Amino acid sequence: MEKRDFFKTSLLAAGALLLPRKMFALEYYPTTKNAEWAILYGSWCGSSRDASVWISEGMNGVVNVFDVRENPDLSKYKYIVVGGSIRSNVTPKELQDYLTAHKGELKNKIRGYFAVCGNMKQPVTQVQYKNFFDNHLVKLTGAEGLPSKVFLGRITWGLMEPDVRKQMQSFPNMEEYDNLKRSECMAFGQEILAAMK
């Protein structure tokens, strides 16, 4: 390799490292150009990430999916679905902070909510819907009366923070489990689209 080529390659590589972090945000490109839909999620261990991708599949892939930790710019999207993993009846702090900071911009765009919660392996009841949506996400966004769904989640010890894992393992007979179902997430995506007709 000649010095000139080496120098050019080195400059390009250095330039690539200086690109803004947002350019590498977790964005799933839809099957159509100019997507009008976005899903914004907050997750601790990845369950809500998977639920978001599966919801987008149920919406025929016309959705871009964003992790709130990437601090995405959602201004170009017409419709937004918001959701996240739940611990002690709340979503991750990053999602709460984002929704609070962008409440005015998002309120009229939100078209659905979802929550992923292990719920101690118990069936979901109206109590969870009231706690997660009416008492939490709706208060953060101001958007109410929208399609909402609570999905049972999963526990993977290796993905949990040590203190949370220790607390969860202190419950009798608590073991790893996975109750998140792709078919339920996809059906909810279809429900959101149907509500727009």
Where are these regions (language model features)?
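Structural motif
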Residues: 78-79
